[in-house]
Amino acid sequence: MMAKKYVLALDQGTTSCRAILFDRDSNIVGVAQKEFTQIYPKPGWVEHNAEEIWSTQYGVIAEVVAKTGIKPEEIASIGITNQRETTVVWNKNTGKPVYNAIVWQCRRTTEICDELKVKGLEETFKKKTGLVVDAYFSGTKVKWILDNVPGTREMAEKGELLFGTMDTWLIWKLTGGQVHVTDYSNASRTLMYNIRELCWDEELLGYLNVPMSLLPTVKASSEVYGYTQPDQFLGHSVPIAGVAGDQQAALFGQACYEPGMAKNTYGTGCFMLMNTGDEVYESKNGLLTTIAWGLDGKVTYALEGSIFIAGAAIQWLRDGLKILESAPDSEYFASKVDGTDGVYLVPAFAGLGAPYWDMRARGAIVGLTRGTTKEHIIRAALDSLAYQTKDVLGAMEADSNIKLQALKVDGGAVANNLLMQFQADILGVPVERPQVIETTALGAAYLAGLAVGFWESKEELAKRWKLDYQFESVMAEDQRNKLYNGWEKAVGRSMDWATEE
């Protein structure tokens, strides 16, 4: 027996697959990352090829092991964290997907959502799942596949198909088709799972017309689900022992273990989660109630504000407008101006998420004058991340009656000091950036390590959280209010735009 020295985190994101090795001191020993194809068949539709995701994920596993020179048998366990809601349905006999994976950002099921709302079912879904009826969540995506891909409805009725979010798909592949499971956090994003009773909800499945036989078994976020088939994992059998959706994993990696602690992750989208312990808060302000994780025999809940477009707005400046060479350049250009000169950019490219939930909103740049420069537009795009975060924090404080003391942040954009300073200024609370900003992968590693005794307790893990920098708010309150009022006006102009004539 070789000593177990590492935990491997698989981070299956929206645009890339990553494999990150952590040692016992939670240091990153190796990282491999590879992007995969984004498929846009029609405006507002987004797909991924699930087979390509698997081969990309397997490729980075092999790469990180080769690059670091470690032996696969030194890996104590594997943790998986994933883009949530993205839906794949596959044939359980052949292992082949019946259609591309439908991505969380995809709006194709807007009409299915409208039908559910017209039938007056929104409250029922909200009460049971903690979610709003929106094209974002998995349930309507599964329904769309069964309604639109020829032959799938019959196969589903015969019990020949399986549904999974990306965690489920990867575990199924890694175990050679032996294990069909998900965890509480991912199940809570499907629109089919009752977060109070902790079971798949037959009434909701009836409304969506999805057979129970498709659904995975729901387990805790930290337990041994199964073992890798040696031929699917570099010739070795390693326990898969931790799973959480990417945002819940980041909350765990940020050591937000006490009720009232919150983090904001800046990625493709922006996601703020606040731990609410065993309280299920029903949001009056457009937030989601979700399961943070299942651990030690109990479930922890969270309030979540989901912002669809954050870093993706900067990618659009780079790829769409081509006014940036690379995303990090945004800080350089934005720092060339004192502010936006009255310009606001509302990145509602895929509708608006929390707290507005307007599927028909579209992007807008307002306040343009002849004096507007590319620097102003870049600055306005960065500022939009901070404004959207303020929208969500306001809703969170109203729902929970908890006044946030500080906001922990993570994700790629937190390296941008200008953005982080503006975030602190516009919120009026300190913004805390940790030393390890890979908190999503860290959270998955922690869950997997705890399950096999690689780490003892979450108390031990909480002590490891270290601050890199605290951004203090220096903006005067009247200035903050003036800027934010302008933002609210700009959002109003972007709403209810994409209407059918």
From Swiss-Prot:
ATP binds at T14, T15, S16, T268, G311, Q315, G412. The keyword Ion transport does not apply. Activated by phosphorylation and inhibited by fructose 1,6-bisphosphate (FBP). Sn-glycerol 3-phosphate binds at T14, R84, E85, Y136, D246. Key enzyme in the regulation of glycerol uptake and metabolism. Catalyzes the phosphorylation of glycerol to yield sn-glycerol 3-phosphate. Homotetramer and homodimer (in equilibrium). This is Glycerol kinase. The gene is glpK.
